[in-house]
Amino acid sequence: AGCLLVFEAFDNAAGRTVIRVKDARMVVAAIIGVLHPTVAPPAGIHPTAVVASSAQIDASASIGPHCSVGENVVIGAKTVLHASVTLYSGTRIGANSIVHAGCVIGADGFGFVRMGDSYRKFPQVGHVEIGDYVELGANTCIDRAALGVTRIGDGTKLDNMVHIGHNCQIGKHVLIAA
């Protein structure tokens, strides 16, 4: 290499040309972003998506193929739903969020009440609120609250296959990996 990108504390340059930076990983990520920019999908609703008439979708959002958007769903500006995402009724997603393929948001949580020798389903009547700049990995599931709200805070990132149970409150800028 003609030049090495190294942490500030790197002390073994041995005559090589180096560029010292505070956070080499962050700088490399920025360089890769310039060399390989992300191409956002076009705004709009794919013709195979099924969208309830009461859903409110910002004109700059992108709804991918085979998505299902339920009653009273709200989707913010520049949010992207990739293929086969399901948003149950009442789900709210903020701006600039990315929901990868196969996510299910707002399905019933695992709520049951013992009734003698059997179980009865505990009604799940809450909803899900997802903040701004959230990214949900493929096939992530977030259950609606039994009562109230299941919440994912601004800037939070969830890995593929993560499951968030009903009534969970995930704060801002949290990373969760499966």
Predicted regions and their residues:
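Short, Asp-centered acidic motifs that coordinate Mg2+ and/or phosphate
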Residues: 3
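Short, basic phosphate-binding NTP loop
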Residues: 6-53
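Structural signal for interior beta-strand "rungs" in well-ordered beta-sheet cores
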Residues: 44-178
